[in-house]
């Protein structure tokens, strides 16, 4: 068995590659490449291996799209490939290609304590189910269960479940967005574009015309307290994040914890801490007491996708992760 394996975390814009120490899971020599500068993912990998003069026989690549078979076609990029053909072309003995949130979920058992921030609840119960979700360009969701001392990630497209309002204000948001979009999924409000949808719906429901704002503009105005509509949108975003996380916790009784990943929330961490997130997480009527002890964590590790891809591969190779 080789000392190092190749791991990757590939999104619509960038491809992050690194080496993973197989024995320890340590991530080394990480580098980010622009996906726009290469014709294929295989070309990026060859470039990385050439630059680092690395010989590897095992690899795990996490990609932001559903993985349903040998043929992988990225949702937000032109790259498409056969897993078997790529494995052969790269001379690998073993190539795993997994969903990006499968990778993030697999990082949970190996996350250092200093790489998470807790938002309420008590201590996680070892070996109990875990939920992980995150808002970025879209809304990613996964669950994690421990079976016979092995962690199994339950991948899915949970971000596309129905948006379920639970207040008059949220009812108004749904009415506006339904008129525009037809089906309104959770991702339509819990993502970068979703924050824009919330802002627009708030303004339209008041019979006014919204400005053309980007997510960063809405966040900046909310934090500066210079726009009431933007502040309402960001506050509502935090509340709906809580409601959605509570739903995930109920699905599998996730006493192992609920983890938040993704690029949006860390940009307004102090606002998030003071928001209605935790109250909304527990706002489940007769099951409020059930949720009070379930801890919620924000992942602050800079590269959870790479860490999780390494953990996924190491477990496949026979290593036992923390329970």
Curated annotation (Swiss-Prot):
E.C. code? 2.7.1.2
Residues that coordinate or bind ATP: 8-13
- Cellular compartment(s): Cytoplasm
Q: Chief localization class?
A: cytoplasm
Family label: Belongs to the bacterial glucokinase family.
Recorded hits in CDD domains, A to Z, give: ASKHA_NBD_GLK
Q: Which GO terms describe its molecular function?
A: ATP binding; D-glucose binding; glucokinase activity
Listed under GO biological process in this entry are: glycolytic process
- On whether Transmembrane is a keyword of this UniProt record, the answer is no
On whether Kinase is a keyword of this UniProt record, the answer is yes
- HAMAP family recorded: Glucokinase (MF_00524)
NCBIfam families in the cross-refs: glk (TIGR00749), PRK00292.1-1 (NF001414), PRK00292.1-3 (NF001416), PRK12408.1 (NF009073)
Q: Its GO CC terms?
A: cytosol
Pfam families, alphabetized: Glucokinase (PF02685)
Q: Which PANTHER family match?
A: GLUCOKINASE (PTHR47690:SF1)
Stated name of the protein: Glucokinase
Which keywords does UniProt give here? ATP-binding, Cytoplasm, Glycolysis, Kinase, Nucleotide-binding, Transferase
Q: Which domain of life is it from?
A: Bacteria
Catalysed reaction equations from the record? D-glucose + ATP = D-glucose 6-phosphate + ADP + H(+)
